[in-house]
């Protein structure tokens, strides 16, 4: 925008869309030299919409600076000239606050000189006319003011100020003028823009004075502040702080530092003193040295220094006659001195003795020398030491030592670990001679009676402390066809007794059977009546035929190999007119049919069984009815289920399941993490009786010892040399140990469910 001559205004008109209201901006620039600076002009703005006074101010402050603030008559004339007429006129930035008309932009009260009220205004009609309007282009009072209620809607008359954030360098008050501004500098500042700061000049400080200054506005200028202190050994004489005033003068003269003074000293009785005073007599840094006459010694420091606090470094020493400190009487000893009373002066002597059981450590006689020291330290009495003894194997030792570890009057008590017996004295004492009153005892392992394997069974024992000794564990299992009667595991207790009576192996029995009606029964019993291995032969009377198996055997599962047969009278029937559907043998099963009236004719009976490891699901026999229908559907053979294996340790398990998960023929292998060994079998197979061939193993840390290896060989004696040859035998023993059965037995119909070491087979079906 081009400049205009001083005192003239050139209006420019432009339209902008701002907040939905069309605004007409009248702006004028005045180019004039103020304090040798060019400043921008004040710009006036107004809204095209009418608002209440409050909303008018919001509008002005949002888009410009504020509601217009009238500064002089020329400004009023200019506004009346350039602003268009509006019938409800314009709001300006004056409002009644606390009953005083106030310029809201500066919060300054309106002065009488600046008032431009219309005639008979302000009149405050109805006591609510707190805001001011300006009559623009009014025929009766152009440019005059009138008080109005603030809620009335008028146009907002706004301005954009010449004063900016950095005007007057922020070091003075910016005062708006028409088209410009002037600066009223704060105290301590000067210049057209208040850009200069008053200076007080550099402070000259005396010797030993320390100064620390802060200069917020420049070195040694207005508001600079300097604090003073003294070097060590000096004290301040004068003000501790100076400040540069707005007048450019310091608040006071700088202080000076004087040396700190200590109290005067004199030589002690029977002594001399020599002093050095580098600054002043008995002042900071002065030092005095003291010496005592012959036959006396100084008590205290022989050199004193005057410190920065005005105090001597040590109290004044004294000279006292030479004497030795009283020696201490040794504990558990006695002392005899010459002279026996008074102070221990030069040439005094003392002798020492110890009580029984103690020996003197040091000189037995000492003398007070001319230096005030004894010729040797006072001795002490030490309890006689008894020799250390090895702690017996499997034993616990508890010693009380009143005068030191294993010394005179020490008492040691012995006890054996659980499962061991004490042989010898349970308590020994250290005597005054330095010897024990007896030898330490020994602990021998508790033994139980030898254990034998049950008949028709086997036994596996772990004996870490020797054959049939404490902590020995024996597990029992029976041969196939037998069940365990009694505990599966026995332990050798600390009392030397097994935890129970050895078990026996009893033959598994099948249910009792009887001769069929019109038939005969003949049985042979290997292991008792109807025990496992018993075989029964059936036959029928004359004119009767056998329906079913002629021979049945009691199996290891406690079941007969086939249902008992029946005897039926022989009759002649005509050929059947109907046939039942031909039957097929079930998978993994067997079928045997008796055709009385032709193949699969009426009364044909078919018997079904399953191969080893499979159980029948359905009827074990079907009969063909006269209607041509079988009495039931063909049964199926399902693989026997073993209990699911749940590993509660870190054992890794890998299983193959040919007939379904954890079924007959399933084989699981086990492995331990690196650094652990497998305790049990590396493999378990689901057997035909629904039990696993081996117990679940566990993982345990540690290595196999020679003693454990010998134990698993039944306690056989082998020389250490033989075991070491090539490491071969030890490796074989490790392999043997890993395969060792842990004694857990398969479940059978006579087992106690939940007994320690027995697999509980929840899938076992006792029905035929």
Curated annotation (Swiss-Prot):
Say where the lipid (S-palmitoyl cysteine) is covalently attached: 745
Indicate whether Cell membrane appears among the record's keywords.
yes
Q: In which tissues is it expressed?
A: Stored in the alpha-granules of platelets and Weibel-Palade bodies of endothelial cells. Upon cell activation by agonists, P-selectin is transported rapidly to the cell surface.
Q: Which InterPro entries match?
A: C-type_lectin-like (IPR001304), C-type_lectin-like/link_sf (IPR016186), C-type_lectin_CS (IPR018378), Compl-Cell_Adhes-Reg (IPR050350), CTDL_fold (IPR016187), EGF-like_Ca-bd_dom (IPR001881), EGF-like_dom (IPR000742), Selectin_CTLD (IPR033991)
- Positions with a binding annotation for a carbohydrate: 123, 133, 146
GO cellular component labels: external side of plasma membrane; extracellular space; membrane; plasma membrane; platelet alpha granule membrane
Q: Does the keyword Membrane apply?
A: yes
Which residues are in the C-type lectin domain?
Answer: 58-158
Instruction: Provide the residue span(s) of the region labelled Interaction with SNX17.
Output: 759-768
Give each disulfide bond as a residue pair.
60-158, 131-150, 163-174, 168-183, 185-194, 200-244, 230-257, 262-306, 292-319, 324-368, 354-381, 386-430, 416-443, 448-492, 478-505, 510-554, 540-567, 580-624, 610-637, 642-686, 672-699
Coiled-coil-forming residues are none
Glycosylation sites recorded in the entry for this protein: 398, 603, 654, 661, 679
Topology check: give the Extracellular ranges: 42-709
Biological role stated in the UniProt entry? Ca(2+)-dependent receptor for myeloid cells that binds to carbohydrates on neutrophils and monocytes. Mediates the interaction of activated endothelial cells or platelets with leukocytes. The ligand recognized is sialyl-Lewis X. Mediates rapid rolling of leukocyte rolling over vascular surfaces during the initial steps in inflammation through interaction with SELPLG. Mediates cell-cell interactions and cell adhesion via the interaction with integrin alpha-IIb/beta3 (ITGA2B:ITGB3) and integrin alpha-V/beta-3 (ITGAV:ITGB3).
* Homology family: Belongs to the selectin/LECAM family.
Name the UniProt record assigns to this protein: P-selectin
Q: Which organism is it from?
A: Mus musculus (Mouse)
The lineage, from the top, is: Eukaryota, Metazoa, Chordata, Craniata, Vertebrata
Task: Tell me the gene name.
Answer: Selp
């Amino acid at each position: 925008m081009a400049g205009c001559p001083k005192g003239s205004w050139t209006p420019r008109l432009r339209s902008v869309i701002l907040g939905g209201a069309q605004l007409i901006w009248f702006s004028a620039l005045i180019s004039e030299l103020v304090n040798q600076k060019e400043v921008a002009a004040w710009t006036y703005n107004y809204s095209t919409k009418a608002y209440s006074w409050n909303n008018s101010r919001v509008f002005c402050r949002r888009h410009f600076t504020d509601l217009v603030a009238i500064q002089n008559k020329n400004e009023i004339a200019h506004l009346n000239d350039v602003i268009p007429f509006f019938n409800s006129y314009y709001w300006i930035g004056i409002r009644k606050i606390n009953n005083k008309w106030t310029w809201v932009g500066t919060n300054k009260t309106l002065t009488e000189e600046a008032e431009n009220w219309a005639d008979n205004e302000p009149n405050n009609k109805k006591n609510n006319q707190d805001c001011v309007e300006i009559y623009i282009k009014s025929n009766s009072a152009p440019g005059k003011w009138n008080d109005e209620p603030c809620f009335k809607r008028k146009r907002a008359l706004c301005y954009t100020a010449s004063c900016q954030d950095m005007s007057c360098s922020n070091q003075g008050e910016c005062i708006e003028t028409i088209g410009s501004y002037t600066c009223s500098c704060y105290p301590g500042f000067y210049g057209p823009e208040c850009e200069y700061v008053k200076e007080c000049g550099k402070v000259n400080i005396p010797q030993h004075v320390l100064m620390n200054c802060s200069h917020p506005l420049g070195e040694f200028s207005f508001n600079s502040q300097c604090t003073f202190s003294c070097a060590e050994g000096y004290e301040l004489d004068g003000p501790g702080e100076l400040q540069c005033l707005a007048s450019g003068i310091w608040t006071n003269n700088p202080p000076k530092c004087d040396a700190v003074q200590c109290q005067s000293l004199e030589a002690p009785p029977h002594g001399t003193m020599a002093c050095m005073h580098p600054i002043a007599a008995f002042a900071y840094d002065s030092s005095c040295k003291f010496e005592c006459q012959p036959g006396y010694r100084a008590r205290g420091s022989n050199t004193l220094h005057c410190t920065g606090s005005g105090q001597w470094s040590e109290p004044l020493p004294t000279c006292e006659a030479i004497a030795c400190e009283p020696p201490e009487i040794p504990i558990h000893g006695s002392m005899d001195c010459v002279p026996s009373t008074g102070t221990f002066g030069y040439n005094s002597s003392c002798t020492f003795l110890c009580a029984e059981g103690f020996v003197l450590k040091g000189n037995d006689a000492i003398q007070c020398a001319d230096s005030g020291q004894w010729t040797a330290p006072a001795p002490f009495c030490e309890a006689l030491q008894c020799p250390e003894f090895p702690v017996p194997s499997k034993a616990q030792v508890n010693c009380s030592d009143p005068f030191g570890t294993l010394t005179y009057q020490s008492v040691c008590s012995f006890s054996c670990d659980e499962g061991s017996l004490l042989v010898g004295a349970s308590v020994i004492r250290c005597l005054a001679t330095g010897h024990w009153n007896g030898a330490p005892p020994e602990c021998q392992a508790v033994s139980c009676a030898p254990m034998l394997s049950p008949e028709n069974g086997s036994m596996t024992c772990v004996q870490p402390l020797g054959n049939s000794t404490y902590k020995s564990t024996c597990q029992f299992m029976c041969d196939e066809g037998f069940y365990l009667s009694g505990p599966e595991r026995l332990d050798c207790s600390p009392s030397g007794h097994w935890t129970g009576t050895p078990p026996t192996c009893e033959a598994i029995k099948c249910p009792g059977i009887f001769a069929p009606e019109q038939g005969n029964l003949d049985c042979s019993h290997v292991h008792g009546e109807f025990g496992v291995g018993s075989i029964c032969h059936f036959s029928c009377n004359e004119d009767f035929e056998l329906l079913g198996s002629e021979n049945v055997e009691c199996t290891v599962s406690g079941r007969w190999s086939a249902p008992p047969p029946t005897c039926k009278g022989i009759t002649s029937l005509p050929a059947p007119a109907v046939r039942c559907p031909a039957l097929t043998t079930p998978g993994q099963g067997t079928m045997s049919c008796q055709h009385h009236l032709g193949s699969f004719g009426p009364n044909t009976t078919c018997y079904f069984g399953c191969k080893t490891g499979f159980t029948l699901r359905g009827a074990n026999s079907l009969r063909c009815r006269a209607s041509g229908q079988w009495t039931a559907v063909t049964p199926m053979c399902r693989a026997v289920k073993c209990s699911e294996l749940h590993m509660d340790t870190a054992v890794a398990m890998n299983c193959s399941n040919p007939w379904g998960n954890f079924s007959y023929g399933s084989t699981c292998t086990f492995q331990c993490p690196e650094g652990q060994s497998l305790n049990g079998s590396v493999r378990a197979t689901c057997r035909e009786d629904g039990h696993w061939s081996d117990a679940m193993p566990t993982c345990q840390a540690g290595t196999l010892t020679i003693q454990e290896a010998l134990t698993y060989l039944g306690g056989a004696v082998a020389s250490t040399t033989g075991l070491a040859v090539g490491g071969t035998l030890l490796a074989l023993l490790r392999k043997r140990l890993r395969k060792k059965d842990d004694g857990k037995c398969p479940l059978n119909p006579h087992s106690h469910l939940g007994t320690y070491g027995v697999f509980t087979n929840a899938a076992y079906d006792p029905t035929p």
